[in-house]
């Protein structure tokens, strides 16, 4: 094996990453995103696919993003996501049409709600991505 020097190699502590949009999105702000088959981010329509993170407010004009534009994606820590329905503090959260909803058995989870929220309110979420166990 070749000799390697890892001096200067660091763990990236950034809360966000920059990804390429796989589709045009009218308003990406505070929506949950997933990767498409090309490795670009798109709105997560439901909880059936692994979640990349959520947009922490980007886009040019009112959150509008064109296919190929750069999108900021928050991948860890705590953030605010638009709610797609009523969510209670402590519930596991997944995506429905890009918005946060209560996760069902087998769904991919973006995290746990740290606040209550009604539909179209912001819900505070501690990001902790995993797949919820299927019902037995």
PLM regions: where:
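Surface-exposed, low-hydrophobicity beta-strand/loop segments enriched in small/polar/acidic residues
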Residues: 1-136
């Amino acid at each position: 094996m070749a000799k390697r020097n890892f001096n200067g190699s660091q763990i990236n502590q950034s809360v966000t990453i920059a990804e390429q949009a796989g589709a045009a999105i009218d308003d990406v702000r505070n929506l949950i995103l997933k990767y498409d088959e090309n490795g670009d981010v798109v709105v997560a329509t439901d909880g059936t696919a692994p979640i990349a993170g959520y947009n922490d407010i980007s886009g040019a004009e009112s959150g509008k993003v064109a296919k190929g534009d750069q999108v900021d994606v928050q991948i860890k820590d705590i953030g605010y996501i638009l709610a797609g329905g009523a969510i209670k503090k402590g519930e596991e959260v997944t995506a429905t049409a890009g918005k946060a909803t209560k996760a069902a058995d087998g769904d991919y989870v973006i995290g746990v709600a740290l606040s209550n929220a009604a539909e179209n309110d912001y819900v505070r979420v501690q990001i902790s991505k995993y797949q919820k166990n299927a019902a037995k």
